[in-house]
From Swiss-Prot:
Domain of life: Bacteria
Subcellular location: Cytoplasm
Protein known as: Phosphoribosyl-AMP cyclohydrolase
Pfam families referenced in this protein's UniProt entry, alphabetically: PRA-CH
Organism placement in taxonomy: Bacteria, Pseudomonadati, Planctomycetota, Planctomycetia, Pirellulales
Annotated binding of Mg(2+), by residue: 83, 85, 87
GO MF annotation list: magnesium ion binding; phosphoribosyl-AMP cyclohydrolase activity; zinc ion binding
GO biological process: L-histidine biosynthetic process
Organism annotation: Rhodopirellula baltica (strain DSM 10527 / NCIMB 13988 / SH1)
Catalytic activity: 1-(5-phospho-beta-D-ribosyl)-5'-AMP + H2O = 1-(5-phospho-beta-D-ribosyl)-5-[(5-phospho-beta-D-ribosylamino)methylideneamino]imidazole-4-carboxamide
Length: 126
């Protein structure tokens, strides 16, 4: 295995298809803010590598999810990193619109206090 290729043999099996999936973290290329966590299969990886746009695998739909195809909220990939075990992918992206399907900039818009109280920490993008 090449050191720059993710190890899909170490992936988590997809509940619908059984194919191995690896977690893919999307991070804002300018601010470093974590935008979302999604999953990639080998086909999503290959499409992301060959283009400059983030492509994921939807576990609920059991198919490729080309970020922005329906919402227009695409992610242009600026850099790709793979962790030391080659089982997690980090995409540095230029985000158009909201990364979150609930129309927040980031999927991590909830803060949980030590007592369990939850707070919404940002406004929805119109």
């Amino acid at each position: 295995m090449s050191s720059h290729v993710p190890n899909f043999d170490a992936g988590v099996p997809c509940p619908k298809t059984g194919q191995p999936l690896l977690p893919a973290i999307a991070q804002d290329a300018t601010t470093g803010r974590v935008l979302m966590l999604a999953w990639m299969n080998r086909e999503a990886w290959d499409e992301t590598i060959s283009g400059n746009r983030a492509v994921y695998f939807s576990r609920s739909r059991g198919k490729l999810w080309r970020k922005g195809d329906t919402s227009g909220h695409a992610q242009v990939v600026r850099e790709i990193r793979v962790d030391c075990d080659a089982d997690t992918i980090l995409l540095s992206v230029e985000q158009t619109g909201a990364a979150c399907h609930e129309n927040y900039e980031s999927c991590f818009f909830r803060r949980v206090d030590p007592d369990g109280t939850t707070h919404i920490t940002e406004e929805r993008i119109a």
